[in-house]
Amino acid sequence: MAKIDLLSLSWRRRKSTKPSNGEAIPLSFYEMWDRVSQFAAEIRGSPFMSEMMERRAKFGKGGTMAALDCATLYALTRFQRPKIVIETGGFIGFSAAFILKALADEKLTTARLYSIEADEHCEHWALVPDDLRPQLVPLRSKVEELARGDQLPSTIDMFFHDSSHRYRHMQWEFREFWRRLGDRGLLASHDVNMTRAFAEFVADTYAHDKRTELLDYDRTRHHEWGRWGYIGFMIKKAAA
């Protein structure tokens, strides 16, 4: 029996849908769903995934992502092809390993991942493979202190949140790093189910037509957004 890609199917249906005023909603990022799905499938069946899951099991699963979310993060990074990435909550480097693997697979040899971890007692970035470390910039500090200083790039291509999931802290990180993203920059977050912070942040970027009460794409401040597993993401649309 042929397999049906439910994710792609749902978005094909969306692509054919028009609002009541007859104007098609722009779907310039429609193709990303097939590409992200393909990248995620590739990494899930790869020796790298098997190796990282073995490392995770030996080290302890606490505070690390499961395979689905790792594959999603890897796939989003490959799709985005960022030159500068910032992640918070770097911890023992499990998520960093998948970001760095995506950069390597896209042959982005000059790209850099700034990984921030405030916990002084964990084994920082212990799970990052040696061959992926050259593109890692480890930062042991509170993100608030780094944001006030000049140690972080003012312009970035991708941000990944996985530090404290307290509501107000998530809100603050989203605002702080959203402003550093340019047009088509990617903001992603783990554990978006923990609070309403991500859902609210997405909602705040929407604009609606007063007459039709449908999406006003020109005034909306994102190109696309979604959730896959426990990772949510947004692609920024800068003001014209």
Residue positions per predicted region:
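Rossmann-like AdoMet
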Residues: M1-T64
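S-adenosylmethionine/decaboxylated-SAM
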Residues: F59-A240
